[in-house]
Structure formats: structure tokens, C-alpha cells
């Protein structure tokens, strides 16, 4: 079995986790939105690329829309996915150029750029395990998209305090988390075992931390911590005990960072910004700490990818908002996008209501 064959499992895991963490009345729309984003990304990636390139491009496009759920239209999902798929292709080419920058001899006319060339040769970390072109890019995009889309209706009270909107199907989200774990083998099989250690230690840490913080364990935060630990573990590439420590830190930081975003009216029910945006930085920080890489190496790579995704999302979001197609109509969102847009609910046998 080719490693690229695991990527669809990772994509399915992300879709299921988002659908499970969202509202019941928008679960179908969330799933369809994810399929649209994945499909657009795969088609763009397939232009002049291999099947693995197409799947990586589709995964990046999908992850960029995770967390938005039923807050955006299918048009928005398609446009955002197309923009990030193109950004992914550009970032892959840029990474290859920067990674080889130290091997090129600059002509005399460009001699003034020699310090920049030397700086890139030292501090640019190549895109291993698609850490920049997929994960960090998607994390930055998700942050920008969540800020442009705004919170779900009713998520915050008039005094600014967040109102509880519990995940409607945590078992579905849990299945999604396990599929993310299995599918992550596609990014780097040699790093997957260490990443597994980080992921499960992050899961347990998040359960314990939420128990201490809230008085009850919170599975939704635990799944976010699991995802963060998985990506941080892939990014760190360290041995067993350091991977264990990376997971512990990732489990705490994922919860704390998601809560911090919530206080700033960034409604991220999946924790995608922590899992895909912050976790790669935690991974390379672990490399610095345990001497696997020199201090500072990789932070430029991470920053470029996150910034590229963030700017792309803000620009596309502003354009879509200007045309009035960014979000569904408030009446559709309140009544449920499944019924209003598709004429059928994900759970027709149950009464759908807000928790």
C-alpha cells in the first residue's frame, strides 16, 4: 500500500471531526462543504502533478476550511479552497528554491543579495512531512477565514461572554480523530511512531488538564489536543521520551490557545488553528530544545507559510463578503442550513434543537 493512499483517511478524519464538533442542524452542510473544498484542491493539484501532489493539495484546501462548518456557503468553500490550493503549489516551488539557495552562485549583478542567500541557507528548513505547504499554510488560512467569517450566531452573549455550543456528536469527532492518526502516516512514515506517542500523550494531558480546569473532562478539547500532539510530533521528529514531552506540552497549549482565541471572538470549535497553525511551531521548537536543529532554524519557513495562508484568507474573505456570498443568510443559519439549503436534515428522526 502506497503511503499516499493514507491521505484520504486523514481528509475523512478532518471532515468527520468538524461535522461532529459542529451543530446538528448544519452537519450535512459541513460535510458537503468539506467535500467541495477537497475536490477543488485535488483537481487543481492534479494539473501537472502526481497523484500524491493532488492529494496533498486537496488536503491543504480542505484543512483551510475546517472549523467554518455551516458558517460559509459552498461558493466560499470552493473559492477559498482554490486560493489555498494555488498557494500550496507556489509554496512547494518556493520551498524547493529556498532549500537549494545556498548551492547557487549569485551573478555579480546580484552580489548585494548574498547576505539574504546565506541567511536563507541557514534558517530555512525544508518542507519535510508537508509541514509548511499543508499544515502551517492551513493553520494560517483557518485563522484568517475564521476571523473573516465571524462567530456562529448565538455563540456570544450581548456582554461578550461566550455561550456554550457543545459538539453535537462527539463519537463522530472521536472517529475522525482516529482517522487523522491513521492517515498521518502519509506525511512521513518514519516520523509517525513518534507522532503517535505525542498524540496520545496530548490526549491524556488534555483530559487531565480540562478536569483540573473545569471540574469535568472535556472530550472535545481532548480531541483538539490529540490533533495538535499528532502534528507537533510529526514536526519534532524526536525520540520516545522527547515525543512524550512534546505531547504533554501540546495538550496543554492546544486547550489554552483555543480558549484564548475564544476570548477574542474567534469561534474555532475544532481547534484547527492550534492543531495546524501552532503545532508545527511547537514541533520545530522541540527540535531546537533537544539539539536536533540549531536555534531559529525553521521559524522563517513556518512564518512564511502561516502568513501566506492568513493573507490569502483575508483577501478572499473580504472579496466574498463584498459580493454578499461569504455566509448563508442569517435565517438559513438559524433554521439550519441542512433543511434550508438541502431540504433534509442529517438526523431526520430526531428533534433538532440548540443545546
Indicate where each model-derived feature is located.
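Hydrophobic alpha-helical transmembrane bundles of multi-pass membrane proteins
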Residues: 1-355
